[in-house]
Amino acid sequence: MNRTIEYLITEKEDGLRIEQFLRRKGYSGQNLAEIKRMPKSILVNGVHYYMRQTLTAGDILKVIICETKCSEKIPPVEIPLDIIYEDEDIIVINKPAGMPIHPSMNNYYNSLANALAWYYQKQDKPFIFRCCNRLDRDTSGLTVVSKHLASGSILSTMTKNREVHREYLAVVKGRVTPSSGTICAPLARKEGTIIERMVDFEHGEEAITHYKLIIEANGHSLVSLKLETGRTHQIRIHMKYLGFPLIGDYLYNPDMEHMTRQALHSHHMEFAHPITGEWMSFTAPLPADMANVLKD
């Protein structure tokens, strides 16, 4: 994907080498190495510069990204996409349940990556798939994908630093009590399986989930959940640990009476735009299969 990013150098940034300035903006060392290999990728006031050269307050720095390769082994497939937002740097998708993020052995042609490969192929744009918040196949809702190497690196760092704020909605069995709280229960891989996780206070990694009851209906609760950590299956295990498992969860509560997938939805997401710094906020409504469980 091609992108020209422009920066106005401030007094505080006066005297920095270009590579120092870009590292402060969140570009990785690998990003800088790739940009160096691109022809005339750094311009200052319209003149070609090298990464080691210094900047002066008032300079206009342009970073010209030109990616010509596409993700290998991701065949383009025409699959509808619910696009919530798109600009030159990111695309935000409301992913349906049942769609994997990446192709895999049994899901080679039905992933989000396949759909986006097709979407950009139609526009004659090379596309490398860089998903910044990965959802389980049967979890619906918001996910953000970067469109070039710089936004990808910056968003990845923001995610690691817990600067991407997410709210999930879940439908669980029973009336949740207390109605709000924080679950601090470390998680580890369950012995004998590569998929399942479990609460393990001795060997597990720190996992913290904040929850709040929204409504209760028909013997089920709709719960809002926010994560401080992003462990595999964290919400699913923590709610089961609390005594209120997600309905339809084939791994941790295999009761398919009301739903045939875990009732979990990535509902809301907020973060600073990786390039402009503008605060971004997105919401995806509760999907019908979850809403129907709560109807009288």
Give the location of each predicted region.
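Pseudouridine synthases involved in rRNA/tRNA modification
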Residues: 1-36, 81, 201-208, 215-218, ...
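Catalytic strand-loop-helix junctions within cyclic-nucleotide turnover domains
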Residues: 176, 217-221
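RNA pseudouridine synthases
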Residues: 1-182, 186-188, 289-293
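Beta-strand scaffold of nucleotide-dependent catalytic cores
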Residues: 181-186, 197-198, 209, 223-225, ...
